[in-house]
Curated annotation (Swiss-Prot):
Its main location: membrane. A motif (AIM) lies at residues 178-181. The gene is atg38. Residues 50-78, 390-420 form a coiled coil. Transmembrane segments: none annotated. Functions as a part of the autophagy-specific VPS34 PI3-kinase complex I that plays a role in autophagosome assembly. This complex is essential to recruit the atg8-phosphatidylinositol conjugate and the atg12-atg5 conjugate to the pre-autophagosomal structure. By binding to atg8 at the phagophore assembly site, atg38 helps establish a positive feedback loop for recruitment of phagophore assembly proteins, including atg8. Changing V181A: Impairs interaction with atg8. Impairs autophagy and decreases lipidation of atg8. This is PtdIns3K complex I subunit atg38.
Length: 424
């Protein structure tokens, strides 16, 4: 039908050319119009099947894509919550590497149990191999459990169903986002130990504020007297000296009050110094503003007592700045020690993760074997020829339209010229 209409259109166009040569412009316009209508009919008859065929091809491609996506989804053995959890934190994810590929997973809400899925045929072959890329790494599992417990992140071992003939476990996965923990990036223990000014957990300055601080063991007063703040104040020099002389005269107890200065104490032997080692550490913490992570409240207050006793034996305090510096670095024993009067030397540093090796999320598009281009069959060749006919017909229509417009102008000019001749 298309070929008949095409032949008929060419005949009309040829007749129009003949009439144009003979001078019958009106007849030529009529034949050109018939040829144009024939070409328009050809375009309509050939374009509709092409559009329908293209739409069917697109629908078929979409159906194939949907089927491939459904096949790439986890099977019934894999919980659905696992695939959901891997998409909750895409910015903390990196591309899948064979090292952390596993066939076990952590169930959400239960961080101590792992589910062992059925091993695939590929894993069965590699079970006896020493270089098993799909084995479970205990350190990685421990880090995942720690993160999921402490930080509440969406961490899980990611599993993709693997067929026997697949070269990788996720070749048909269209949306991959796996959380990979790099070594010691989230090692909480190492980060606290590496802090230079980290304080000890035994430091009472960082204990609960609700806990009552008990009086020190070297006080020679009762607990009730200590709590009522009725003991002798140490700010008065005479009372302080009187309090020292009222104590026992044992050499071991008195020797610590007889050391003239810190520099002289360094030259004495340990038998004469008594607690010289602890006093050296106290001085270093006082004047170097170092951390008191290895000291306790008792050692700090005893060191302050030693400093005051040394200055008192020498006869007078050196200056007020020295007294203020001691009072700022050591708690005042004239008051009940509380967490407000004990100044924390350093605060616990906020945990900051070192520069991570995480990469941006890697979303793999559908990958597989490259489709081979099929050989052109009879229907394909017919379709291509039909499309070519449509294109040629559209070009021919444009040419005929321009030719008709030109002839109409010539016809108008001819009619006007004949009218002028008749008038004359």
């Amino acid at each position: 039908m298309v070929r008949y209409s095409l032949r008929k259109a060419h005949e009309y166009a040829r007749d129009g050319e003949n009439q144009e040569v003979l001078g019958e412009i009106s007849q030529a316009i009529m034949y050109y119009g018939l040829a144009k209508s024939q070409f328009e009919k050809i375009c309509q008859n050939t374009a509709q099947p092409l559009i329908k065929r293209c739409a069917n091809n697109q629908i078929e491609e979409l159906m194939v894509r949907i089927r491939e996506l459904r096949e790439s989804l986890p099977n019934k053995q894999t919980p659905i919550s696992m695939s959901m959890s891997t998409r909750l934190s895409p910015m903390y994810t990196s591309s899948l590497t064979p090292r952390f590929t596993s066939n076990s997973m952590v169930l959400p809400g239960d961080h101590n149990t792992t589910v062992r899925l059925k091993p695939s045929f590929r894993e069965a072959l590699m079970e006896d191999s020493e270089d098993d890329l799909y084995q479970m790494y205990s350190k990685f599992e421990m880090q995942v459990k720690k993160l999921s417990t402490n930080y509440g992140l969406a961490v899980a071992f990611s599993i993709v169903p693997m067929d026997d003939d697949q070269p990788s476990p996720s070749i048909f996965s269209s949306d991959e986002s796996f959380l990979i923990v790099e070594g010691d990036d989230f090692s909480l223990g190492n980060s606290v130990e590496e802090d230079a000014n980290a304080t000890s957990k035994e430091d009472p300055a960082y204990q609960n504020t609700n806990e009552q601080i008990q009086p020190l063991s070297n006080f020679d007063i009762s607990q009730q007297e200590y709590l009522n703040n009725t003991r002798i104040p140490y700010e008065n020099e005479d009372l302080h000296l009187q309090h020292i002389t009222q104590g026992t005269t044992d050499d071991n107890n008195v020797s610590k009050f007889l050391i003239p200065s810190y520099n002289d104490a360094k030259e004495l032997s340990e038998e004469e110094m008594g607690r010289s080692h602890k006093r050296e550490e106290s001085f270093k913490r006082a004047f170097g503003h170092a951390s008191s992570s290895e000291s306790s409240i008792g050692e700090i207050t005893d060191s302050r007592e030693d400093i005051q006793s040394n200055r008192l034996v020498n006869g007078s305090w050196e200056n007020n700045d020295f007294t203020k510096e001691i009072n700022n670095n050591f708690p005042d024993r004239s008051e009940t020690p509380t967490l407000q009067t004990i100044e924390a030397p350093t605060k616990l540093m906020k945990y900051t993760r070192r520069k991570s090796l995480f990469r941006f999320p890697f979303f793999r598009s559908i990958s597989g074997k490259k489709k081979e281009e099929p050989m052109e069959s009879g229907t394909d060749s017919l379709e291509s020829s039909t499309a070519q006919i449509t294109v040629d017909s559209q070009l021919k229509i444009k040419q005929l339209e321009t030719q008709i417009a030109t002839l109409q102008k010539q016809l108008e000019q001819f009619q006007t010229s004949t009218l002028d001749q008749d008038l004359h």
